[in-house]
Amino acid sequence: MKLNEVKEFVKELRGLSQEELAKRENELKKELFELRFQAATGQLEQTARLKEVKKQIARIKTVQSEAK
């Protein structure tokens, strides 16, 4: 993600409720699990997607902690 995309993503996250953030986090965790499984079996083509999903999860957790 480019810097502008990251800023847009975080801005969007800050507009969501805690429940919506938790839902989005769970979706990304499922995607991360699937990506790790693909990587382990040698089927993953976009290896950078792993890093991107991890960072998105971290951003969601950061926004959640800011709201507390």
UniProtKB/Swiss-Prot annotation:
Protein name: Large ribosomal subunit protein uL29
Cross-referenced PROSITE patterns: RIBOSOMAL_L29
Keyword Ribonucleoprotein: yes
Species annotation: Streptococcus pneumoniae serotype 4 (strain ATCC BAA-334 / TIGR4)
Molecular function terms from GO: structural constituent of ribosome
Classification via HAMAP family: Ribosomal_uL29
Keyword Mitochondrion assigned: no
Disulfide bonds: none
Annotated GO biological process: translation
GO terms for cellular component: cytosolic large ribosomal subunit
Coiled coil: none
PANTHER family referenced in this protein's UniProt entry, alphabetically: 60S RIBOSOMAL PROTEIN L35/50S RIBOSOMAL PROTEIN L29, LARGE RIBOSOMAL SUBUNIT PROTEIN UL29C
Lineage of producing organism: Bacteria, Bacillati, Bacillota, Bacilli, Lactobacillales
Stated family: Belongs to the universal ribosomal protein uL29 family.
Keywords (A to Z) from UniProt: Ribonucleoprotein, Ribosomal protein
